[in-house]
Every structure is written in C-alpha cells, then in structure tokens.
Amino acid sequence: MTGVAELDAFLEKLSLEEIECHGLVLETNLCRVTTRSVGQTMIGDRMITYHGTQRAVTNNHGSTVYGGSDLICVRGGWTELEKLPMDTQARLAVSQARTYDRNTDRYPGFLASRRNYDIGQGIDGRGRWRSGVFEASWRSGGASTAELAALMAFAEDPALQVVEATSVKQFGRRTTIPRGAVIHFHDDDPEDGPLLRYTVVTRALRRAA
C-alpha cells in the first residue's frame, strides 16, 4: 500500500466481526532489509542465547524464500550474549528482542523452551532506517537445527563459551556440502523440488571473541 486511500479501501472490505475475531496487523514495508534472529533455547539445565542473521535464497519456482540462519551462540543467558562484541545494528536487535521477551514476565507460569524473535532492519517508504521485532516464534523453526547443534557442542565440551552454527536450505541439484555438516534432507521434495537441508558448526571458542 502506498497511501491512506489504499488502506481505507482495504479496511472497508473487512467486517468488524472479522477484525474483532482475528485482529489486524499492519507492517511497514522495508527495502534493503536485513532480517536478524535473536533468541534463547533451553533443554533441561542447558541454556544458550544467540543472535544472527537470516539468508534469503531463490527456490526452484523463482521465488525468494528463507534459506537458513547464521547464529552466534553463547552458553548462558542474555547477560552473556550482551558481553559479545557486535555491531550497532546487531546490538539494537538484541535490545529490542530482550524488551519483547521481558514482557512474558507479565504472564505467571509462562514457559517456552525456545524463544526466537525476528527483527527487520531496513529503509522505509520515507527513506528512514527502521528496526523492530516483527515476529515471535516459540516453537521449532528454521534456525532450530543450528540451536541444537550449538547445544550439543556445549554439552560435549564444557570449556566452550561461544559456538557459531549455520542452518542451510539449498534448492536445485547443484549443491555444496561442507565437511562436518549434518544432513537433514537431500532429495526431491514433492512441493519444493530438489532440496538440501543441513546444519554445520563453523566455529567454537573457549572464550568470548
């Protein structure tokens, strides 16, 4: 939508009952977007917290889709993550995700073993740089395999403090699989066609970088 008139025309098509039942979400359209993932995953007494970026790829039908995530994971919680060196945009994304996450404290007894927040950063229609959380995911998602790979690495080596892990989704028959990757799927998908999905730990440090 490019203006208020288009928005009004769209809203006129919706009934009040639909809005009351399903709600209405409006998002700012951004150009030159970077999508960042920030979150926390806990299994048993083991917790990691992470930040990273998502990858966009072209699928077998010519559409731009999610192609995986590159995560930097720390052992522990938000405080440990914030000790890592990171650029200004990444630090803002972590701050915004943590603010969003803090609101779960308003719901006594709330528990989510995975809390992932997607933050969009880009240029709006007026040429201004914007950043904000546009999705919260408290279920398994595209980056979950990278999170699990980091958890496993931390479990296998108690001295590790930082793990960088990547989840990858590649379309087509020309694919590259790096050494040490765990392959989840490498075949023809009935809907997506030739598809490769794998996860790999790319770096592990015994102290913060």
What are the residue ranges of the model-derived segments?
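Glycine-centered flexibility motif
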Residues: 1-4, 23, 52, 62-63, ...
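A long amphipathic alpha-helix within ATP-dependent nucleotide-binding catalytic cores
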Residues: 8-31, 61-128, 164-192
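Generic structural hydrophobic/aromatic packing signal, biased to beta-strands
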Residues: 26, 38, 51, 117-119, ...
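Internal metal/ion-chelating core segments
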Residues: 1-54
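C-terminal active-site "lid" helix and adjoining low-complexity regulatory extension at the edge
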Residues: 138-139, 143-209
